[in-house]
Amino acid sequence: MLSDARELASDQQIDADVCMVGAGPAGISIARELIGNGASVWLLESGGRDVERRVQRLNVGKSVGYPIHLPHQSRIRAFAGTSRHWFRPGDETWAARPLDPVDFEVRPGIRYSGWPFDRAHLNPYYAHAQVLCGLGPFDYDPGRWSDPARTPPFALPPGPVETTLFQHGTADFDGYFEELVRAPNVTLLLHASVVELATREDPGRVHRVEVRRDDGSRCFVRARLVVLAAGGIENPRLLLLSRRVHRRGLGNDRDLVGRFFAERLSARTGYIVPATPDLIDGAGFYPTHVAAPGVHVQGALRLTDAAQREGEFLNCAFFLLIRDLSFTVEAVRSLATLVKARRRRPLPPELLGHLRNIVTGLGDLGATARARVRRSDPAGSVLALRAQAEQMPNPDSRVTLGTRRDRFGLPVAKLDWRPTAADRASIRASQEAVDTALRAAGLGRVEFMLGDEQPPALFEGNFHHLGATRMHPDPAMGVVDADCRVHGVSNLYIAGSSVFPTYGCSNPTLTVVALALRLADHLKKQLAA
């Protein structure tokens, strides 16, 4: 069923068995699992069926740490949530990959590492999530998807570097709208901006969810079970806003809500100079391509799990992008970086260095421009390396409440994102291993672009907001337990990437959906009890 909060009476109360806050991939996945369950399910979405500018302004935020895309740039309030960023004209697929087994382990040298369960425990949910995400079979063995005659992976020697695989999903979560609207026991409530999880009747239980409508008036949802699925920034923000009873915020008795905030680090870290031009022609496994009917895949290079354990490295995948020789010119790279960052606020910390490269490299820029006009610059001369890397869990990297307020008079999210020297060092060490492997195979060598500066230059985020309501069985170490229930609150659960204790190098949505399906199984048991 479909409803709109703007059409409800002021102060109206809705009674439900399950109230879910946020209709992105996590909320949609759980709601679908509860169709026909017999429970009354309300799925609350701050936005409407489509993106609306007025609603999107509620995503205003502030950055006080390393430059990061602000919430109004990176988050979307509308049905299907931030997954709407993935589907743009000419780019109708999105990258997906499960976390690696090593990501779930307690890793020496990686502080705060370890999940409450291993990868094998999550595999059945991953297999189910593949279907929801429009992916191929749950098989990420590169050999399964490569054509030896046409797109073989690089022939690397046995050792620490391997080719890994990403699939590209085709499922648009917006496509689940009609299914949910038709469900007799599920009500999708649009334009319902949640502002508080109230615990005034019992400090250990959410007794109702307060919703604000466009005009500022209120309505309420009272539910047996509440699931917060509002995204990696809004999840901690809503807990911190719920402070009428819990003065530090709901679930924040140990000052953990908002801490360990991470992004998936992305950076152009170097390029491969091929030993022969044949390497470019033989790199067809690494760009996104169709490997089987309906299955899009992309290869990347990474350290094996064993090499990560031995070297105490963070996880990192290197995508290979075919580029012409202009990519090797510092002035060209700096100009491209500043053009790409023109909408970032604040500006990149390496701004002066980029400007210096441009000024001192005006001759190179001119030569490159003339070559482009004449089309005389040979295409595909190098393979650019783009790292997609894990961050070290860092309690000082966090989401808090700022002094600025949104139109409801509530503090906006303040992001203090803090990549560390360990993050940069791990990427560089991983890239050195790639260089060694390529040289040993006679394929080429790596030219490095990532320096030793701190804060690290070149880093940017991928809109992957992670870790700020982390999972741990010990309430002194995490916000939610192994069932994703908030410690100390009997009926409040959190879904989404904010519960990740560590982050891996994979795009998070497949794992978000797998965890949501796992949580749905738990909710069914609670409803039946």
List each language-model region with its residue ranges.
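Mid-to-C-terminal "cap/lid" subdomains and adjacent gly/pro-rich loops that border
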Residues: 29, 225, 229-230, 237-379
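Extreme N-terminal leader/targeting segments of oxidoreductases
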Residues: 1-18, 36-37, 517, 525-529
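Short beta-strand "acidic-cap" motif of Rossmann-like dinucleotide-binding folds
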Residues: 39-45
